[in-house]
Amino acid sequence: MKQVKYGLAAGVLCLASISAHAEINQIRVWAAACANCHGTDGHALKGMEALAGKDKDEMLQKLMDFKSGRKPATLMHQISKGYTDEQLAQLAAYFAAQKK
C-alpha cells in the first residue's frame, strides 16, 4: 500500500512539473509577440520601453489601463485586448522576473 501512495505522489509531482513547464512555455510564446517592439525578453532597443525588470504591479496596471482605454496608445490598447486579465498578469510577472 505504501508503494502505491509513493507512486501516486510521484505521479502527481511529475504532472505538476509538466504543467508548470507547459505554462512557462505558453507565457514565452505570448512574450515573443512583445519582442517586435520591446525586444527579446523585454530588453528593448534604444527608443523603445524596456520591460525587463520592471515592477510587476506597475506593469500590470499599465497593461490594464491600455486594455480599458484609460491610457492612450497607438497599438497597445488593441494588443492588450487580445489577452485575458490573467494572461496580462502572467506577462507582467514574466517580464518583471527578467534581468535588466
Task: Please place each PLM-identified region on the residue numbering.
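Gly/Gly-Pro-rich "capping" loops immediately C-terminal to redox-active cysteine motifs
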Residues: 27, 41-71, 77-83
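Bacterial N-terminal signal peptides that target proteins for export
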Residues: 1-8
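The canonical Cys-X-X-Cys-His
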Residues: 32-40, 91
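C-terminal capping alpha-helices of c-type cytochrome domains
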Residues: 11, 68, 81-100
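Electrostatic cytochrome c docking/interface patches
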Residues: 14-31, 47-49, 60, 65, ...
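Short N-terminal leader segment in a subset of presequences, especially plant chloroplast
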Residues: 9-12, 35
